Structures are given as structure tokens and as C-alpha cells.
């Protein structure tokens, strides 16, 4: 059994879809590291520290989940964390092509690192951070898509 898995992402912001996948991963693996990518090329709305804090709030009830920010190659971060599995989410068939390319690239960079794909529950399958930010930016209510603390943080960002 794989003991340690990494669920990487930008999480800008963390959504109920992400939380759903984290819950599922926490049941499958002894320890799950949520790797929050610094990824400055995406121009995140929240700083890395803010994203780490929000994810810690969202996952506080899960004893086997740890939240860590990182920069650089994911395969290097996985090695540093002694993880042998990457958890990735698939919302729709359209996600598969990109995720398939990523999985193959990661496998080339580290043949011992496996990618496992999880799907969120149906009610969370359409949620994306991009859509949540767009709704919030235009003054819409995002409370059904994110944790209450994330909703507050989005409101404070304006």
C-alpha cells in the first residue's frame, strides 16, 4: 500500500471540489500532502501563505492531511516528501487530455511516481477556482462552492 500521496495544485482558491477530493484521498492513503504550488506565472489572487492558511482551515478535521507550499518541479517536491503517488482530480472528460500529458511527463521525470485520478462527487464536478473567482469578482454569492472562510477571504479581496 502506498503510504504517502501528494495532491498538488494552485488552489486559488480552494473549492468544495478540491475539499471533496482531499477527503477521498485521505481515505485511500495513510498520509496526504497538499502541495500548493507557488506558480507565479498564474498570477494568483491569493498569496502562497494565504492559500496555505485557507487549506489548513479547510482540512483541519483530517488528521492525516498536511498542507505545504512549494516551488519548482513537482517530482522534486514529491521526492522531498517521500511520496510515491500524485493525486489528480478529473472533473470532466475535457480535463483528461491535459492530465494524461502531465502524468506521462511526470512518469518520464520519475518512473517511480504514479498518478492516480479521482473524480469529485456530482454536485462538485463543475466547480473550478476560475469560475468561483469570476462569480466573486462580480459580487455573486460563492458560499455554496467554497468553505465559509474561503468565501470571507474572497469578499475581503474585493
Swiss-Prot record:
Listed GO biological process terms: coenzyme A biosynthetic process
Cofactor(s) the protein needs: Mg(2+)
Species for this entry: Shewanella woodyi (strain ATCC 51908 / MS32)
Protein's UniProt keywords contain ATP-binding: yes
Residue ranges of the TM segments: none
Gene3D superfamilies, A to Z: HUPs
Protein name: Phosphopantetheine adenylyltransferase
Annotated substrate binding sites: 10, 42, 74, 88
Amino acid at each position: 500500500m502506498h503510504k504517502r500521496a501528494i495532491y498538488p495544485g494552485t488552489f486559488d482558491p480552494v473549492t468544495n471540489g478540491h475539499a471533496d477530493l482531499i477527503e477521498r484521498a485521505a481515505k485511500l492513503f495513510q498520509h496526504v500532502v497538499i502541495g500548493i504550488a507557488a506558480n507565479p506565472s498564474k498570477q494568483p489572487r491569493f498569496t502562497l501563505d494565504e492559500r496555505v492558511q485557507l487549506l489548513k482551515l479547510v482540512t483541519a478535521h483530517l488528521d492525516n492531511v498536511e498542507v505545504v507550499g512549494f516551488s519548482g518541479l513537482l517530482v522534486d517536491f514529491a521526492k522531498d516528501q517521500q511520496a510515491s503517488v500524485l493525486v489528480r482530480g478529473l472533473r470532466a472528460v475535457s480535463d483528461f487530455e491535459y492530465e494524461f500529458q502531465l502524468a506521462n511527463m511526470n512518469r518520464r521525470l520519475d518512473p517511480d511516481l504514479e498518478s492516480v485520478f479521482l473524480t469529485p462527487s456530482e454536485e462538485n464536478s463543475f466547480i473550478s477556482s476560475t469560475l468561483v473567482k469570476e462569480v466573486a469578482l462580480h459580487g455573486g454569492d460563492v458560499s455554496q462552492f467554497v468553505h465559509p472562510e474561503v468565501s470571507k477571504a474572497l469578499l475581503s479581496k474585493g
